[in-house]
Amino acid sequence: MVKLTKRIGGLVLRLAAFGAALAALIVMITSRERASFLAISLEAKYTDMAAFKYFVIANAVVSVYSFLVLFLPKESLLWKFVVVLDLVMTMLLTSSLSAALAVAQVGKKGNANAGWLPICGQVPKFCDQITGALIAGFVALVLYVLLLLYSLHAVVDPFLLQKS
């Protein structure tokens, strides 16, 4: 019964992480807004910034990985390798989220020293979508940290319980 509960707990955690990464991916991909003032037209989209593209690619990789691991049989010998891949996915999410957060902060506040003006006043819907994608990405990251701890416990625990 305990093993079944652990298996279901891990499955629910993986499913939630998959959902959060997929949500971050979809919200970021659909972020686009066009604004016009005077004779100038401005279109903001995620492809304008390399950090946002990296965020999309990272969340796509994590989503595909999360989906595939959901179908891995519990008897598979690959579960020890899954722990390593969980760590890689956690690091990938961390780096992409931090890069996207830095760019989003500049978009929101600007940078007076560099002469960069904030754009969120002109394209608020775009900025709101970026914020939503970053929140979903942060949820995915937290879930992946928990998943990594869970995976480590599941793989290491049998070794600790063995009698010498």
UniProtKB/Swiss-Prot annotation:
Regions that span the bilayer: 8-28, 52-72, 81-101, 130-150
Protein name: CASP-like protein 1C1
Membrane topology note: Multi-pass membrane protein
Gene source species: Arabidopsis thaliana
Family in the record: Belongs to the Casparian strip membrane proteins (CASP) family.
Quaternary state and interactors: Homodimer and heterodimers.
Superkingdom, taxonomy of origin: Eukaryota
Cellular component per GO, a single term: plasma membrane
Keyword Membrane: yes
Cellular compartments annotated: Cell membrane
